[in-house]
């Protein structure tokens, strides 16, 4: 059910605890605070006229002035390419230093849309628990990046490949409980029907797939473990209703791309062995042994010494440590949907509604 603040607000007013009540609603995270400050900055930009739309032939001075609205470190003396590279990194683009089509598109997103993105991401922070496990794995689906936290501090990150807009990776939280070394791939029926069965049995056999009977009398496709398995050499399992997981991949080309939303929904990892080693480091019998286990070519499940929390999140706006805002595209249109819900909710707010639930004031 949607959170209804009116009962607790009425109680806070009656008990003269309004400041404490308001403070309790704010997510206790630097990520949220960075967005809150960013929102104020972008609202100020909007209130002073926003920014003009740039053309591909815009002069260097016009481009520099546009960049300076979001990046206060832009100066008139530094090369324009350096300022463009900073902007491209903030937008998750290839930092060529050129005003290419993707950069132009990002710069021409309206300030109102940037504000809507910030507000949508602030709302997602409100969905988070009040405390996060200090040791955890976080995947930013929109940015296709995995970050490992230990002691509540980021210790390593790697590129990932997340779900395409038509095969979306879900937002969820769970716990990684085990790693499958040299996993076979039990091909989901949706993929088998659309992509594999149409190739014909002979082609599938040549490509190393096996067709096996199901208990119900049907057929399914299995790709045996090995260097060419779609799951690579490692699969990280966690309970969830979407049948998604983290895994290795033999197809490494996408990791050098800045457009990495290309999977069927699971998350492919750039450095799976490094991630596995971090997860088993506290077990002397497993620490440093992941590659040796892979080299046996045997399929085996390794239970983790302790389960590791995993969060699949969708951040399209976030602040750097210096307060500069970063943005990513909204490939699933989740920002757009959430912005519509936020706007609809704000229209439904009745500023007098609290009076209907508040107790009579005491003398």
Feature annotation, model-predicted:
Residues 3-7, 11, 17-363:
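Well-ordered beta-sheet/strand-loop patches within structured domains
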């Amino acid at each position: 059910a949607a959170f209804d603040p009116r009962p607790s607000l009425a109680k806070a007013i009656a008990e003269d605890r309004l400041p404490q009540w308001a403070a309790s609603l704010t997510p206790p995270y630097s990520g949220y605070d960075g967005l809150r400050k960013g929102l104020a900055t972008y609202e100020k930009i909007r209130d002073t006229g926003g920014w003009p739309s740039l053309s591909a032939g815009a002069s260097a001075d016009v481009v520099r002035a546009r960049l300076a609205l979001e990046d206060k470190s832009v100066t008139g003396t530094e090369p324009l390419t350096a300022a463009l590279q900073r902007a491209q990194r903030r937008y998750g683009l290839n930092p060529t230093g050129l005003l290419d089509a993707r950069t132009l598109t990002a710069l021409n997103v309206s300030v109102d849309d940037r504000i809507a993105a910030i507000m949508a991401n602030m709302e997602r922070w409100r969905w988070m628990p009040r405390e996060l496990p200090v040791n955890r794995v976080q995947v930013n689906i929109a940015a296709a990046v995995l970050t490992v936290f230990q002691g509540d501090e980021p210790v390593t990150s790697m590129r990932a490949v997340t779900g395409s807009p038509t095969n979306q990776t879900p937002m969820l939280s769970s716990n990684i409980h085990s790693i499958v070394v040299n996993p076979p791939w039990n091909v989901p029926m949706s993929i088998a029907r659309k992509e594999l069965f149409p190739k014909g049995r002979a082609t599938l056999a040549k490509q190393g797939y096996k067709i096996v009977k199901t208990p119900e009398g049907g057929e399914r496709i299995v790709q045996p473990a090995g260097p060419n398995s779609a799951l690579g050499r490692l699969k990280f399992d966690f309970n969830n209703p979407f049948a998604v997981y983290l895994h290795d991949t033999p197809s490494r080309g996408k990791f050098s791309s800045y457009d990495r939303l290309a999977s069927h929904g699971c998350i492919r990892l750039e450095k799976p062995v490094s991630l596995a080693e971090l997860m088993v480091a506290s077990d002397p019998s497993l620490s440093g042994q992941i590659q040796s286990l892979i080299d046996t070519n045997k399929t085996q499940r390794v239970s983790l010494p302790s389960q590791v929390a995993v969060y699949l999140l969708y951040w399209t706006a976030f602040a750097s440590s210096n307060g500069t805002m970063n943005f990513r595209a909204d490939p699933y249109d989740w920002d757009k949907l959430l912005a519509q819900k936020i706007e609809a909710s704000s229209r439904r707010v009745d500023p007098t509604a609290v009076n209907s639930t508040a107790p009579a004031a005491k003398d």
